[in-house]
Curated annotation (Swiss-Prot):
Taxonomic classification: Bacteria, Bacillati, Bacillota, Bacilli, Bacillales
Organism: Staphylococcus saprophyticus subsp. saprophyticus (strain ATCC 15305 / DSM 20229 / NCIMB 8711 / NCTC 7292 / S-41)
InterPro entries linked to this entry: MoaC (IPR023045), MoaC_bact/euk (IPR047594), MoaC_sf (IPR036522), MoCo_biosynth_MoaA/MoaC (IPR050105), Mopterin_CF_biosynth-C_dom (IPR002820)
Protein name (record): Cyclic pyranopterin monophosphate synthase
Positions of the catalytic residues: 130
Quaternary structure and interacting proteins, as annotated: Homohexamer; trimer of dimers.
Assigned protein family: Belongs to the MoaC family.
Length: 162
């Protein structure tokens, strides 16, 4: 079993020293979702929400969240992100609609951007909830997970669907 890298010799939390790691291009792709009712779906796609364009605002929130991940996740390094993209795909269910969210975050650096991609995806879903909760508070934010990552010593990871 490998040692935990975020624990020092006294058993306390520490931020890992990455100064000896090689610089490489690193990319992470994350997924989240939010399921809404037909009234909220209609409001989002027709841009009639009183707070503004829901998806544009959520995209900006995701970008801001990725850029500020180190401020809210204690052991994350501040990274010079080189790219952040947020995309959406609607899935119609029997009596609801699911907004699938994908975030892609890239950097050229000494540590990966998985947490930035996951934080962005989560912030997007939370922003959609915040902007539409006046209509229905029973929305469900779905699973959030890492789809893939590339770069670094551990190489490529691709999530396998079960």
């Amino acid at each position: 079993m490998s040692e935990f890298t975020h624990i020092n010799h006294q058993g306390n939390a520490k931020m890992v020293d990455v100064s000896e790691k090689n610089i490489s291009k690193r990319t992470a792709i994350a997924h989240s979702s939010i399921t809404v009712n037909s009234e909220i779906y209609k409001q989002i796609v027709e841009h009639t929400n009183q707070k503004g364009n829901v998806l544009n605002t959520a995209q900006i929130a995701g970008i801001m969240a990725a850029k500020n991940t180190a401020d809210i996740i204690p052991m994350c390094h501040q990274l010079p992100l080189t790219g952040i993209d947020v995309t959406f795909d609607w899935q119609e269910n029997e009596q609801s609609y699911t907004l699938n969210i994908q975030t892609i975050v890239s950097t050229t650096g000494k540590t990966g951007v998985e947490m930035e991609a996951l934080t962005a995806a989560t912030a997007v879903a939370l922003t959609v909830y915040d902007m539409t909760k006046a209509l229905d508070k029973s929305m469900v934010i779905g699973e959030t997970y890492l789809l893939s990552k590339s770069g670094g010593k551990s190489g490529h990871y691709q999530r396998q669907d079960n």
